[in-house]
Regions:
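Sequence/structural signature of outer-membrane beta-barrel proteins
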Residues: 43-49, 88-94, 127-129, 144-147, ...
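Gram-negative bacterial Sec-dependent N-terminal signal peptides
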Residues: 2-30
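Residues that define the transmembrane beta-barrel architecture of outer-membrane proteins
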Residues: 62-69, 100-104, 155-159, 209-213, ...
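Transmembrane beta-strand segments of Gram-negative outer membrane beta-barrel proteins
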Residues: 31-52, 423
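Outer-membrane beta-barrel pore domains
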Residues: 111, 228-234, 242-433
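Outer membrane beta-barrel
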Residues: 33-39, 43, 60-186, 213, ...
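Outer-membrane beta-barrel proteins
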Residues: 86-103, 150-153, 194-210, 301-307, ...
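Surface-exposed strand-loop-strand hairpins of Gram-negative outer-membrane beta-barrel proteins
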Residues: 45-67, 191-204, 411-414
Length: 433
C-alpha cells in the first residue's frame, strides 16, 4: 500500500560473491601486499525540541546519529590488480533502534593503463563531493554533512561495474567515471498518527530494489575540485507494485465530502528516477575555501514530495589547526506538491452513521505523510580542530527552520512539522588509524 521515502544504506555484498571475485584475479608470482586502516566517529548531538529530527536527534541527546566505527583492507596483487574491503558498524538501515555491520566497499580493481581504472564488486557512488568518504569524518570539516543535499541520493552504493578514465592537463586532472549496478536498500517512512499496518505513530522501513547507472565528470587540482553528474535510478518495491498517485474519492452523503484513498490509484512496477548533481570546492586567498553543491531528483509516485532540489553554500578558513566554517542549506519540493500535502493533511470528513469518520481522518494524516515533501533551510556555524594528523575534534551549532512541512522531522501526534524552529548542538571526535 505504501510507496517510498528517505533512502538509507544498501545491504552488504554477500561474502561468497566477493570471494569469487577475488579468486578470479590472476595473481602475480610475488607476495600479495596488504595495507589496513581504521576509522571512526564518536558523535553527540542534542536539540531543543522533544521530537526526533533526522531519525535520532531530540532534547534527550544522542550518540547514535553520527557515531560509526569501520575498517578497511587494501590488497595489491600486482601493479594492475588489487582489491578493497571496507566494513562499518553504524545505525541500522532498517530499524531506528538497532546497529548493523555492513560492507561499504568490496571490489576488485584492474588498472590496465595508468589512466584507466576498472572496478567490479561493491563500491560507493560518486554523487556528491563527500559521498564516497561520508563515513570517514576525519576527511572533512563539517560536523555533519548537510542533510538537505546528502539525503537526495536514492542509494549510496551498488554492486556492479565502474570504469573511470583520467586525463592529466596542467594544472587539472580530469576524471570521467561511468558506472552501473544494483542495490538492496530500505527507505524510511514516519506516520504521525498511524503507520502502514499499525494503529500507532512510528516509523517503518520498506525494502527496495535499485538499479543505478550514471556518468560523472570530476576536475581537480591541488586546491580545487569540480564535479557534475547525471544518474538514472530504477527503483521497485520487493513486495508489491508502487502506488503512482493517491486519488480522491467522494462519499455520496453530502457536498464536498470525500477522502484521499490509499487503497486505490494507479500502480506501476517500477519508478524511473533521474538525478542531477553539480558541485565545486574552490580555494581562495588567505586560506579561505568556498564549497557549494546542488542536487535534483524527480520521483513520479504517490510520494511525489521526494521530487525536490537541495543545495548549500559553505565558507571555511583554515587557521593553523582550526578550521571554522559557516554554511546555509536549503531543500524544497515543488510548490504544487506542498499544496497537495496541505490539501490532504487538512481534509476531514464529518461524523456519520454511514462510515467510520475517525478511521478515515487518520488515513488522511497517513496519506499526507506518504506524500513526504520537504521544505526547510538550515544555517550552521562550527569548527574542526586537528588534534593530530589523523584525528579531528568538531563542534557545531545549527538552526533549522521548516516551512510547510519537512519529512526530516518525526512530527508529534496531533501536530505536524510546519513552521518548526530546531536548534542542534553537535560535538564529535573523528579519527583514522
Amino acid at each position: 500500500m505504501i510507496p517510498f521515502i528517505t533512502p538509507h544504506s544498501a545491504k552488504a555484498m554477500p561474502p561468497k560473491l566477493f570471494l569469487a571475485l577475488a579468486l578470479s584475479v590472476p595473481l602475480a608470482s610475488q607476495a600479495v601486499e596488504m595495507d589496513w586502516s581504521g576509522f571512526g566517529t564518536v558523535g553527540y548531538a542534542t536539540s531543543d525540541q522533544p521530537y526526533k529530527y533526522q531519525r535520532f536527534i531530540d532534547n534527550q541527546g544522542t550518540l547514535t546519529r553520527d557515531s560509526v566505527l569501520g575498517g578497511q583492507v587494501d590488497l595489491k596483487f600486482s601493479q594492475q590488480f588489487g582489491a578493497t574491503i571496507q566494513g562499518k558498524l553504524a545505525p541500522s538501515d532498517k530499524s531506528d533502534t538497532q546497529w548493523d555491520g555492513t560492507l561499504s566497499w568490496a571490489f576488485i580493481s584492474w588498472r590496465p593503463m595508468d589512466d584507466l581504472l576498472i572496478r567490479l564488486g561493491k563500491f560507493r557512488l560518486p554523487f556528491m563531493l563527500n559521498t564516497e568518504n561520508s563515513d570517514v569524518g576525519a576527511t572533512y570539516d563539517f560536523a555533519r554533512l548537510p542533510v538537505e543535499v546528502y539525503s537526495i541520493a536514492p542509494t549510496t552504493d551498488v554492486v556492479g561495474l565502474s570504469i573511470s578514465k583520467s586525463l592529466f592537463t596542467d594544472p587539472m586532472e580530469w576524471n570521467l567515471e561511468a558506472y552501473t549496478g544494483k542495490a538492496e536498500t530500505h527507505w524510511r517512512y514516519y506516520g504521525r498518527e498511524i503507520r502502514d499496518v499499525r494503529n500507532s505513530p512510528g516509523s517503518w522501513f520498506i525494502p527496495v530494489d535499485i538499479k543505478s547507472s550514471g556518468l560523472v565528470l570530476t576536475a581537480r587540482d591541488l586546491d580545487n575540485t569540480f564535479r557534475i553528474g547525471i544518474h538514472e535510478v530504477i527503483a521497485e518495491r520487493t513486495d508489491q507494485p508502487v502506488h503512482a498517485d493517491i486519488p480522491y474519492r467522494s462519499i455520496p452523503v453530502g457536498p464536498n465530502i470525500g477522502f484521499y484513498d490509499l487503497t486505490k490509484g494507479r500502480r506501476v512496477d517500477q519508478l524511473i528516477i533521474p538525478v542531477q548533481t553539480i558541485a565545486a570546492s574552490i580555494s581562495l586567498p588567505a586560506n579561505f575555501k568556498v564549497t557549494t553543491e546542488y542536487a535534483r531528483i524527480k520521483v513520479n509516485s504517490a510520494s511525489e514530495g521526494l521530487t525536490r532540489w537541495g543545495a548549500y553554500l559553505a565558507v571555511s578558513r583554515r587557521m593553523g589547526d582550526w578550521t571554522p566554517y559557516v554554511y546555509y542549506a536549503k531543500v524544497k519540493s515543488p510548490d504544487s506538491t506542498l499544496e497537495k500535502y496541505k490539501t490532504i493533511n487538512e481534509n476531514r470528513v464529518p461524523s456519520s452513521p454511514f462510515y467510520n469518520a475517525n478511521l478515515i481522518n487518520q488515513s488522511q494524516t497517513l496519506a499526507a505523510d506518504i506524500v513526504a515533501p520537504f521544505d526547510q533551510w538550515t544555517g550552521a556555524i562550527g569548527s574542526s580542530y586537528r588534534i593530530t594528523p589523523t584525528s579531528l575534534l568538531k563542534a557545531e551549532w545549527s538552526h533549522t527552520s521548516t516551512g510547510v512541512v519537512s519529512s526530516f522531522v518525526d512530527a508529534p501526534s496531533g501536530g505536524d512539522s510546519a513552521n518548526k524552529q530546531i536548534n542542534v548542538f553537535s560535538v564529535s571526535y573523528n579519527f583514522t588509524f
